[in-house]
C-alpha cells in the first residue's frame, strides 16, 4: 500500500462512491473543486487507487492544513487505522474538520484527535409543516435565471424576503455549493419581529421552494443558537450530524 499526491480526477470515482455512501448533504463537498484549496492524496494498492484523503489548505484553513475527508473502499477498511496513519505521515496535517455522518473520517480523526470541539449542527428534512403568519408575504429578490445558473454551476443561490405591511421583516435563501441535489437554507429575522414564528414560516417556505426547484433542503446552525435550532425543528428539520474540529496528534 502507498499514499501519494493525486489530482482530483484520479479519485473522482472514489468520491462518487463516498457521496453515495453519505446519502445526504456533504458540507465540505465544494472545496474539492476550488482551485488550490485542497491537496488530494490517493491510497493505492498495486496500480489502483482504493481510497483517498483530502486536506484543505486555503480559505479558512490557509494557515492550518486540515483533514476533511478520508475514504476507503469497504474491502480495505480492515486496515483503516494503518492506512489513515500512512495518510497522516504523507500529508502532515495540523487539524481536522469532519461531518459526523461521515463515520469513517470521524472515527479515524477522533483516534488521533486533541482539543476536540463542535460549533455547527447539520439538519436534514423530515416533515412537511403548514405554519402561517398573518399578513406575511414572501418575495423573491434574485432573478430566476440567476437561481437556475446557481443550481447548475453549484455556486451561489437565491434569496427571498418576508414582508409584513409592506416592510421587510426577514431575509433568507438557499445556497447550492454542495453535492447535488442538496441545498443549504439560511434565514435571519429582524430583531423587533423575532419570537413571532416568522423564522419558522420562512424556513418552511424555503423548503417548499427548494423542492419546486428540484433540490433537497438541508440546513446548518450554530450549537449555541437556540432560537434558530427551534425554528429549524418547528419547520420540519431534524439534526443528523455535527461538524467536529480539533488538532491532530502524530501516529
What are these regions (language model features)?
Residues 57-65, 69-135, 246-248:
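Acyl-donor-binding surface of acyltransferase catalytic domains
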Residues 1-27, 117-159, 165:
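Short amphipathic alpha-helix that is part of the acyltransferase structural core
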Residues 76-89, 195-210, 229-234:
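Conserved acetyl-CoA-binding loop-helix of GNAT-fold acetyltransferases
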Residues 91-101, 210-221:
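Conserved GNAT acetyl-CoA-binding A-motif
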Amino acid at each position: 500500500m502507498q499514499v501519494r499526491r493525486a489530482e482530483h480526477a484520479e479519485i473522482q470515482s472514489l468520491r462518487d462512491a463516498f457521496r453515495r455512501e453519505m446519502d445526504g448533504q456533504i458540507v465540505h463537498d465544494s472545496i474539492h473543486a476550488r482551485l488550490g484549496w485542497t491537496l488530494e492524496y490517493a491510497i493505492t494498492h498495486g496500480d489502483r487507487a482504493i481510497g483517498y484523503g483530502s486536506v484543505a489548505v486555503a480559505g479558512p484553513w490557509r494557515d492550518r492544513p486540515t483533514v476533511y475527508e478520508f475514504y476507503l473502499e469497504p474491502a480495505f477498511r480492515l486496515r483503516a487505522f494503518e492506512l489513515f496513519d500512512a495518510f497522516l505521515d504523507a500529508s502532515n496535517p495540523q487539524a481536522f474538520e469532519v461531518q459526523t455522518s461521515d463515520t469513517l473520517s470521524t472515527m479515524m480523526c477522533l483516534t488521533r484527535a486533541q482539543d476536540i470541539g463542535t460549533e455547527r449542527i447539520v439538519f436534514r428534512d423530515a416533515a412537511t409543516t403548514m405554519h402561517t403568519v398573518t399578513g406575511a408575504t414572501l418575495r423573491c429578490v434574485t432573478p430566476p435565471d440567476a437561481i437556475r445558473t446557481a443550481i447548475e454551476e453549484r455556486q451561489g443561490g437565491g434569496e427571498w424576503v418576508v414582508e409584513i405591511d409592506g416592510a421587510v421583516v426577514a431575509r433568507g435563501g438557499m445556497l447550492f455549493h454542495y453535492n447535488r441535489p442538496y441545498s443549504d437554507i439560511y434565514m435571519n429575522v429582524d430583531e423587533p419581529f423575532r419570537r413571532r414564528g416568522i423564522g419558522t414560516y420562512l424556513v418552511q417556505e424555503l423548503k417548499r421552494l427548494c423542492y419546486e426547484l428540484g433540490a433537497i433542503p438541508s440546513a446548518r446552525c450554530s450549537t449555541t443558537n437556540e432560537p434558530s435550532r427551534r425554528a429549524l425543528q418547528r419547520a420540519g428539520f431534524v439534526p443528523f450530524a455535527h461538524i467536529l474540529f480539533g488538532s491532530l496528534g502524530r501516529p
